[in-house]
């Protein structure tokens, strides 16, 4: 009898906490997230990333999503920023200024001289406020032969909900 009471108690505690955790609002929401891998006829590859991210909390603005980090190898890859801007809650569009694109050494390559050629583009999103939406569209284009095949081993690691997610592969005929 005592074990059944303890089991019931744990069950109700679990139910209580699981219900309260789902009621916690997220700090941001991806309205759209799209990833596209394209294999070109010449063997080069293009990875294209597009996101629309609406911010709801100060934590989302200041630490979680205030910057975007893109790692690439400039010897074999080219980074193209197609668009980067913020649309504020009132509809005002703030284009990302040139000085908000900062190229740094990736943190993981700091004590590894063999990887000091890698670059990390830090895009600092400007004009953020509660209710603002970040729009970012970029491509990393790899030269032919750098990547032997399209190898997507990438978990979806977003801590905020995603309304629309698109994963596309374009292959030559």
Feature annotation, model-predicted:
Residues 18-20:
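N-terminal signal peptide c-region/cleavage motif recognized by signal peptidases
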């Amino acid at each position: 009898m005592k074990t059944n009471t303890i089991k019931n108690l744990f069950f109700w505690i679990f139910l209580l906490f699981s219900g309260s955790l789902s009621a916690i609002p997220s700090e941001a929401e991806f309205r759209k997230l799209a990833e596209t891998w394209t294999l070109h006829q010449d063997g080069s590859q293009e990875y294209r990333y597009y996101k629309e991210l609406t911010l709801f909390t100060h934590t989302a603005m200041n630490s979680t999503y205030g910057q975007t980090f893109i790692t690439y190898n400039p010897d074999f890859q080219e980074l193209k920023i197609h668009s980067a801007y913020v649309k504020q809650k009132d509809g005002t569009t703030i284009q990302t200024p040139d000085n908000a694109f900062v190229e740094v050494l990736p943190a993981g390559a700091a004590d590894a001289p063999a990887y000091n050629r890698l670059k990390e583009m830090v895009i600092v999103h400007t004009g953020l406020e509660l209710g603002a939406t970040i729009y970012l569209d970029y491509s990393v284009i790899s030269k032919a032969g750098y990547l032997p095949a399209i190898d997507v081993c990438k978990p979806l690691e977003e801590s905020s909900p995603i309304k629309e997610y698109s994963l596309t592969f374009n292959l030559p005929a």
